[in-house]
Curated annotation (Swiss-Prot):
This is Periplasmic nitrate reductase. SUPFAM superfamilies: ADC-like, Formate dehydrogenase/DMSO reductase, domains 1-3. Binds 1 [4Fe-4S] cluster. It comes from the Bacteria. GO terms for biological process: cellular respiration; Mo-molybdopterin cofactor biosynthetic process; nitrate assimilation. The gene is napA. Keywords: 4Fe-4S, Electron transport, Iron, Iron-sulfur, Metal-binding, Molybdenum, Nitrate assimilation, Oxidoreductase, Periplasm, Signal, Transport. It is found in: Periplasm. The keyword Iron-sulfur applies. The keyword Oxidoreductase applies. It comes from Aeromonas hydrophila subsp. hydrophila (strain ATCC 7966 / DSM 30187 / BCRC 13018 / CCUG 14551 / JCM 1027 / KCTC 2358 / NCIMB 9240 / NCTC 8049). One of its GO terms (cellular component) is periplasmic space. GO terms for molecular function: 4 iron, 4 sulfur cluster binding; electron transfer activity; iron ion binding; molybdenum ion binding; molybdopterin cofactor binding; nitrate reductase (cytochrome) activity.
């Protein structure tokens, strides 16, 4: 879309009116230019490049460069508002160290694992990549090649990657960095409901009576949603906000009931609430009897560590997600052990605060939304935490209805739309299908026009296991795209860097900037970013949003989609598929993987002319409307069974649509009659992801963390983010205003803990764990206020790699890393 000056000024007026109405008004970005008459700025819409909220922005470009951004007043998510990061989106692509040429480690003009980076051509880059991948495939087979992708990939980039890896190279060693943030939510949804992603939407905010935050600092991590919650709370005196965390943060400033609990004891608190509901006869029996079943989960499942780790060897049921049926009475007996007295003692939360929280959930007149993010998910029992929260909503019937429901928030712009829905996990296929299910593989092979048996049934290496296999020399040709896992991954010293520098391995990193991960690689490929390409993201409320390419990338930088498809041309089918597989479909003989995967009569069916009116480098290069072909093929996976997506062209007109989209209408609340087209008249509620239409209430206990403070390492360490920076700071630290606002990471610490160590605010300390150490400065004031015995350190700072300290323990069911709990000691530097 192109806006006239009048339209643009009108948009500003709408945003101003929203501010007058009581919503915090945005301050326009310092570089925003408003007179299109004088500057001839072209405006178009795009979703924000940062978190999973899915705010829409207006992007202003001039002379081939993005020069301004503003919150989109027509966007239902953010209603014209931006957070501080969104204000400066126009600057994220223009860091001085932007990469524009492939770079290979070389000595004397030849590849050398220990050489220095030198520029090469794209042909040279793909030549050596193809050589290394082909050699690995020939000598070790498909299990020795892999890819680490991203919840920041566009939908079609993730889909193209899934096709290349799972079908083309015939390996499931594809996993996204969303494994580190959303995998526990995925498994939690699947176990309880049989389908992934939230049943509610952001419209719940304006209809809820109360909000409960479980391990989610929405004030800094989802500030636009927090502005809507704040507006609801401050405009309605009876609305309540309850916040639970292992330390106080900015969200506590609005809390009616703030609770700081001992790490890992959220499990016990959740069971206490279920017990309170039962003991006080607040169970919604009509709902429970009709729509739920009870099961007891297997316990003592380990901590996702290496099999040689003593903790893993001690586990009686390592990695087991099994469960057995149980009655309501047995469930009631199970949670009866979690009484107010014992849970208060275990968690450290005063009894009156716990009881106030339980009363809120139990009150049938109160509509409650539960929000959580990494506090639940990055947890060695993260799946259990998700399941236990669902228990509370199911026992009370406060679910799938306007203003009530559990809601897992996402941290990346397309962790839902790309990682989860497309299925770029090591065990998944599109639309909740999995590689271990023969019927699902058959569906994928049919849609992709592949011979039976192309997709392997073996689950691939998940994120943490990929690093372990790199270190052990079992994963040898490896491509990292659109993430900075060397900085973001756990236990960097022992399990991260060794694999990248293993002489047996060839590591490729695609990125716009020379990140920590890129600098550990053998080959770096320069990447186009955000509106330098056409894209699609899926946000936390199931909203799929499209954008057009609005500017060209720097000469030499190519989109991830271009890289994936162009690289596929380097492989003949005979080089990667066994003869018996080719014999099932002789017509593929002599073809390249590009021909089979992307020129299959479906992906290439739309002429490039259909993308006229906007830039589209990929359409021009490949000769067809690549994005439309990939999307329409992908959409066939979900249509007709609850994952319906609208036709491609509809998304370019809308500000996003929430799936399932049936007959052009989006779905706001799933599983509820009157809102969800898959629930028939008279059913009321049906959790149709389960064969019997019933959700599962699980009996699951409190179990301790993998590592806790002891005499030597006497403090808990929790890691996370801050408002001004996003993840590893690759983009935000290159924005001068954001860098100045929070230039360096610090260690947030209780003043008495600092005093006991002879440390004053601002002084340097050494933080060490059993795995490594970092030097940083202490902060005893400000936004984060840890209790005694716990410290918090953000991970955005490449000069202070906090993940040298963290433990690579994971949830055994989801394989998601626990970044919130390990033991450290702090001494004055």
């Amino acid at each position: 879309m192109k806006l006239s000056r009048r339209d643009f000024m009108k948009a500003n007026a709408v945003a101003a009116a929203a501010a007058v109405a009581g919503v915090s008004a945005p301050t326009l970005a310092a570089n925003l230019i408003t007179s299109t008459d004088k500057t001839a700025i072209t405006w178009d819409k795009a979703p924000c490049r940062f978190c999973g909220t899915g705010c829409s922005v207006l992007v202003g470009s001039q002379d081939g460069r993005v020069v301004a951004t503003q919150g989109d007043p027509d966007a239902p998510v953010n209603r014209g508002l931006n957070c501080i990061k969104g204000y400066f989106l126009s600057k994220i692509m223009y860091g001085q160290d932007r990469l524009t040429q492939p770079m290979l480690r070389m000595t004397d003009g030849k590849f050398d694992k220990n050489g220095n980076f030198a520029p090469i051509s794209w042909d040279q880059a793909f030549d050596i990549m193809a050589e290394k991948f082909k050699t690995t495939l020939k000598e070790k087979g498909p299990t020795a090649v892999g890819m680490f992708g991203s919840g920041q990939w566009t939908v079609w980039e993730g889909y193209a990657a899934a096709k290349l890896m799972k079908a083309g190279l015939r390996t499931n060693n594809l996993d996204p960095n969303a494994r580190h943030c959303m995998a526990s939510a995925v498994v939690g949804f699947m176990r309880t409901f049989g389908m992934d992603e939230p049943m509610g939407c952001y419209d719940d905010i304006e209809q809820a009576d109360a909000f409960v935050l479980w391990g989610s600092n929405m004030a800094e991590m989802h500030p636009i949603l927090w502005s809507r919650i704040s507006d609801r709370r401050l405009s309605h005196q009876d609305v309540q906000v309850h916040v639970l965390s292992t330390f106080e943060h900015r969200s506590f400033e609005l809390a009616d009931n703030g609770m700081v609990f001992t790490p890992q004891t959220d499990l016990a608190i959740l069971n206490y609430i279920a017990n309170y509901i039962i003991q006080n006869d607040k169970v919604n029996w009509e709902f429970v009897n009709k729509h739920t079943q009870f099961r007891k989960g297997v316990t003592d499942i380990g901590y996702g560590l290496r099999p040689t780790n003593p903790l893993q060897q001690k586990a009686k049921n390592p990695d087991s997600g099994d469960s057995t049926p149980m009655s309501f009475d047995d469930f009631a007996k199970f949670v009866a052990d979690y009484d107010l007295e014992s849970v208060s003692k275990l968690s450290g939360v005063p009894k009156d605060k716990l009881e106030k929280l339980a009363q809120l959930y139990a009150d049938p007149s109160k509509k409650v939304v539960s929000y959580w993010t990494m506090g639940f998910n990055q947890h060695t029992r993260g799946v259990w935490a998700n399941n236990l929260c669902y228990n509370i909503h199911l026992l009370t019937g406060k679910i799938s209805t306007p203003g009530s429901g559990p809601f897992s928030l996402t941290g990346q712009p397309s962790a839902c739309g790309t990682a989860r829905e497309v299925g770029t996990f090591a065990h998944r296929l599109p639309a909740d299908m999995v590689v271990t299910e023969p019927k699902h593989r058959a569906i994928a092979e049919k849609i992709w026009k592949l011979p039976e048996g192309t997709i392997p049934e073996q689950v691939g290496y998940h994120a943490v296991l990929q690093n372990r296999m790199l270190k052990d020399g079992k994963l040898n040709a490896y491509w990292v795209m659109c993430n900075n896992n060397m900085q973001a991954g756990p236990n960097m010293n022992e399990e991260g860097l060794p694999g990248y520098r293993n002489p047996a391995n060839f590591i490729v990193v695609s990125d716009p900037y020379p990140t920590v991960t890129a600098q550990a690689a053998d080959l770096i490929l320069p990447t186009a970013m955000w509106v330098e390409k056409e894209g699609a993201y899926g946000n936390a409320e199931r909203r799929t949003q499209f954008w057009h390419q609005q500017v060209k990338p720097p000469e030499g930088a190519k989109s991830d989609l271009w890289q994936l498809m162009e690289f596929s041309k380097r492989f003949k089918v005979e080089e990667v598929w066994p003869a018996e597989l080719i014999a099932k479909m002789p017509e593929v003989k002599g073809k390249t993987l590009f021909d089979v995967l992307y020129a299959n009569g479906q992906v290439n069916q739309f002429p490039k002319e259909q993308s006229k009116g906007a830039l589209n480098d990929e359409a021009e290069h490949f000769g067809f409307y690549v994005q439309k072909g990939l999307f329409e093929e992908y959409a066939t996976f979900g249509r007709g069974h609850g994952h319906d997506l609208a036709p491609f062209d509809q998304y370019h007109e809308a500000r996003g649509l929430r799936w399932p989209v049936v007959d052009g209408k989006e779905t706001l609340w799933r599983y509820r009659e009157g809102f969800d087209p898959y629930v028939k008249a008279g059913e009321g509620v049906r959790f149709y992801g389960k064969p019997d239409g019933k959700a599962v209430i699980f009996a699951l206990p409190y179990e301790p963390a993998a590592e806790a403070p002891d005499k030597e390492y006497d403090m808990w360490l929790s890691t996370g983010r801050v408002l001004e920076h996003w993840h590893t700071g690759t983009m935000t630290r290159r924005v001068p205003e954001l860098y100045r606002a929070f230039p360096d990471a610090v260690l947030f610490m209780h003043p008495e803990d600092a005093k006991a160590r002879g440390v004053r605010r601002g002084e340097e300390v050494i933080v060490s764990s059993r795995r490594g150490e970092v030097k940083t400065r202490v902060e005893t004031r400000g936004r984060n206020r840890p209790p005694k015995g716990l410290v918090f350190m953000p991970f955005f700072d490449a000069s202070q790699l906090v993940n040298k300290l963290t433990l690579d323990a994971t949830d055994p069911l989801s394989k998601e890393t626990d970044y919130k709990k390990c033991a450290v000691k702090v001494v004055k530097a």
